[in-house]
UniProtKB/Swiss-Prot annotation:
Similarity field: Belongs to the thaumatin family.
Transmembrane segments: none
Protein name: Osmotin-like protein OSML81
A Pfam family reported for this protein in Swiss-Prot or TrEMBL: Thaumatin
Organism annotation: Solanum commersonii (Commerson's wild potato)
Length: 247
């Protein structure tokens, strides 16, 4: 019986080890509530100031993104809307958010047994963010940041309530969206790159914006407002929510 029990426990541990490639901790340091979103796993969670949400991401997860929604109101059924980052009017996101939203993107256990991850401003900016491995290592396995006052300094043509749109969202087309082949930076994308050099500023900004860590031995942390305050022009208190589901 002892052998069978030990074998069962070993098998269970092996299954857990195989299933989850990384734990991702999402923390809200903003002085207002953020409704975190995560797809294709996780869904969504209300995070008051100082709260944390832990996501267990399976091996092989790809095209994954985490973002913060602001100015949300949800009812007890998890339906409502957000000023930025809304994902179809639901608390539990199954699709991507509506720009603008600062994105933490990742793909786990890809070729060469590496995790690939980045901060992207291709969908614009709404909340300052840090994305970091919990145990940094050599090469491109280190913390990355986008904490500039982008909302306050946003060009007038890109400014929207609660955030700053990427020019691809605002104007579309090959020049800004790289829809028909290679394209380079523009004066508007350089606005983002100058302030957040770690982050994607346009769709083909790969060389300076993609980071890697060893897969299976690295966990991650996403922090909204790592410095505690978003920027002087962003409201310190967002509208109260009736959402009681995910407190």
């Amino acid at each position: 019986m002892g052998y069978l029990r030990s074998s069962f426990i070993f098998s269970l541990l092996a299954f857990v080890t195989y299933t989850y490639a990384a734990t991702i901790e999402v923390r809200n340091n903003c002085p207002y509530t953020v409704w975190a979103a995560s797809t294709p796993i996780g869904g969504g969670r209300r995070l008051n100031k100082g709260q944390t949400w832990v996501i267990n991401a399976p091996r092989g997860t790809k095209m994954a993104r985490i973002w913060g929604r602001t100015g949300c109101n949800f009812n007890a059924a998890g339906r409502g809307s957000c000023q930025t980052g809304d994902c179809g009017g639901v608390l539990q996101c199954t699709g991507w958010g509506k720009p603008p939203n600062t994105l933490a993107e990742y793909a786990l256990d890809q070729f060469s047994n590496l995790d690939f991850w980045d901060i992207s401003l291709v969908d614009g900016f709404n909340i300052p963010m840090t994305f970091a491995p919990t145990k940094p290592s050599a090469g491109k396995c280190h913390a990355i940041h986008c904490t500039a006052n982008i909302n306050g300094e946003c060009p007038r043509a890109l400014k929207v309530p609660g955030g700053c749109n990427n020019p691809c969202t605002t104007f579309g087309g090959q020049q800004y969206c790289c829809t028909q082949g290679p394209c380079g930076p523009t004066e508007l994308s350089k606005f983002f790159k100058k302030r957040c050099p770690d982050a994607y500023s346009y769709p083909q900004d790969d060389p300076t914006s993609t980071f890697t860590c060893p897969s299976g031995s690295t966990n991650y942390r996403v922090v909204f407002c790592p410095n505690g305050v978003a920027d002087p022009n962003f409201p310190l208190e967002m509208p109260a929510s009736t959402d009681e589901v995910a407190k």
